[in-house]
């Protein structure tokens, strides 16, 4: 189960209630971080939800939403960095459906992660193996014998340049369940 918790009290309540993941975690405290790590609770940062509103703030988004976004964006980034640097488990998600955050554009979340200081390798793991683990899909998210062959073929090396994955123009082919 997931909880879209933003404030510290909501995060703690969700973790103590046994949620598998916290989406957003904007106002995470050290206490939240420690309890999440202790219980193995994932953080799903949903950077696109906040970043895309901020980046498109002049494109017709109501002023009160833009004002809230500006107030929380830096704190959201601090919480994610704090959790990542502490070694907390993270999985990728975007909260698609928020303004300028479209279904199918989830690859930009990797760029946002890397922009915050998450390594390219970790951003890929967060988006594949960790996401599959969070969803209870043990036979997906990694390249292993016996697992489903779900692969994105890209131009370039995402370990060197995350835009190989984050920029949809670099996507060459999708292999799903071993089929192109």
Language model feature labels by segment:
Residues 127, 145-180:
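C-terminal cap of metal-dependent C-N hydrolases
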Residues 39, 86-89, 170:
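A short helix-to-beta-strand connector/capping loop
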Residues 36-37, 85, 144, 165-166:
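Extracellular/periplasmic catalytic domains that process cell-envelope and extracellular macromolecules
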Residues 1-77, 91, 96-97, 117-119, ...:
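Active-site core of metal-dependent hydrolases
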Residues 73-157:
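His/Asp/Glu-enriched, well-ordered alpha-helical/loop segment
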